Amino acid sequence: MSRRAVTAVFLLISAAIALSSCALQTEMSPEIFLERLAEADKTLSVDFDGRYYSGDRCYCFVSDGGGTEYVLSMQTCADGSVQSVSLASTAVDRTAAFISLAGKVTSVYSPQEDIKAIVSALFLDGKVGERCEYYNTRRYEYSSASSENGLYFSIDDLRLGERSTPALTLGDLSGYLNRTKPSAQ
């Protein structure tokens, strides 16, 4: 085989792999997302049995190696694919751990994105204060919020539909972490 033929075959295989990973990304169910997140960070404990659905949202509780508990909320499209992912915690004293987990959520949900740029734009100095930050790419909208009540992070896949409604508010966090159903919004 000539060098050109080998190069052409390599490019075709690379393009096929890239296209298949994009196709897998848009067809990720909440269960697959949670499995991939657990695989990405072996220190996370994902409560698969405790997850529940409310309308088009799947809620799941996750705790890290340090014992901090988080709430993950995944909004799904009509076909069951994850359209948005939200992460929340009331542990404002564990901001660094929250930022690290937000980076892992980003790497699983939108692996082709510049995770370092997103996390640094959203969390700036890593300090907690009453503020919201947004970061947009061609395909995703990222947002974060922090207050004395908790920390919040979300990713919306803009190609899968309109921007989702907020999964939860910072005021809802203590209820979520006490294993109650979400309040009416």
Which residue ranges define each predicted feature?
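Post-signal peptide N-terminal segment of mature Sec-exported envelope proteins
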Residues: 31-46
